[in-house]
Amino acid sequence: MSQAALRLVDKDTMDRQKALEAAVSQIERAFGKGSIMKLGGKDQVVETEVVSTGSLGLDVALGIGGVPRGRIIEVYGPESSGKTTLALHIIAEAQKKGGTCAFVDAEHALDPSYARKLGVNLDELLISQPDAGEQALEIADTLVRSGAVDVLVVDSVAALVPRAELEGEMGDNHMGLHARLMSQALRKLTGSVSKSKTIVIFINQIRMKIGVMFGNPETTTGGNALKFYASVRMEIRRVGAIKDRDEVVGNQTRVKVVKNKLAPPFKVVDFDIMYGEGISKMGELIDLGVKANVVEKSGAWFSYNSTRIGQGRENAKTFLRENPAMAAEIEGAIRQNAGLISEALAGGPGDLDGTPVEE
């Protein structure tokens, strides 16, 4: 390349750089400093801040160690599957780190005594029981914009009834009103959620679509907007009962990460939800310990470092509950083998019964 051509290229590059600097300067004058910046700049935090879900297995399945801050999360599933329990565990974990949490109880069904058993500090929990969907979402928007709330739970999307529906007659048809309300609210929320680093968790119910011949007939309420705006979508289902002789003492629960913008999705994790206790940490330590080859299983016996910890899963759980030092040691070993466990949790792009889930 000739000297003249080199000078021409350099001049063109300099002109482009000057034009870019002028554009950035104009944007900053119009919208304030920091309105545009380079992603790899010294002031930019690349690491995603997270809050634990209260389930070691689910933290691993999410790929980043918990639910991400500054994002919208959707938790959905059938009735009595553990949706509110999971949300309350996230609140409890955030409060342990000194965070402020709020609960918008549109269903008017929150049980304070159960929340306390899960580790929620009720004295520090903000709660609202709004009358209409518009009121609930306005309260949520105000709390997010304050920048002072770490976790905000809306329970549930299905209970966010538009005011026009409340004030109308029982048989009136309000086609698409709920979906429009959610779409408008999410458009307003999404920017302030990112700036305030608030985790906004929408709990949702499922409905059956009429006339579906092939594929999964299940869908979530509130239209499609939440499916697009949510960074993480988790499907939670009760897959069995835990019995003590003839008495049912808990649920076997399965969670599938249906959508994940921060790590590979479709991971499936199983854990126990015990009545009056919530997610069984000791049960997870045993199950994940076996998957990570930290805990050895020989027949019905479980052992760790040649020490027998119990015959049968329930006895092993009791042993770990009585020996917190060993439980902490096993947890540390499991976290070190998180990559191995993550591969073991990998599922396929279907729902928990193997049929494709609608995105």
Curated annotation (Swiss-Prot):
ATP binds at residues 77-84. Pfam families: RecA, RecA_C. It is found in: Cytoplasm. Its main location: cytoplasm. The keyword Transport does not apply. GO terms for molecular function: ATP binding; ATP hydrolysis activity; ATP-dependent DNA damage sensor activity; damaged DNA binding; single-stranded DNA binding. The keyword Amino-acid biosynthesis does not apply. GO terms for biological process: DNA recombination; DNA repair; SOS response. It comes from the Bacteria. Keywords: ATP-binding, Cytoplasm, DNA damage, DNA recombination, DNA repair, DNA-binding, Nucleotide-binding, SOS response. One of its GO terms (cellular component) is cytosol. Belongs to the RecA family. Can catalyze the hydrolysis of ATP in the presence of single-stranded DNA, the ATP-dependent uptake of single-stranded DNA by duplex DNA, and the ATP-dependent hybridization of homologous single-stranded DNAs. It interacts with LexA causing its activation and leading to its autocatalytic cleavage. This is Protein RecA. It comes from Paramagnetospirillum magneticum (strain ATCC 700264 / AMB-1) (Magnetospirillum magneticum).
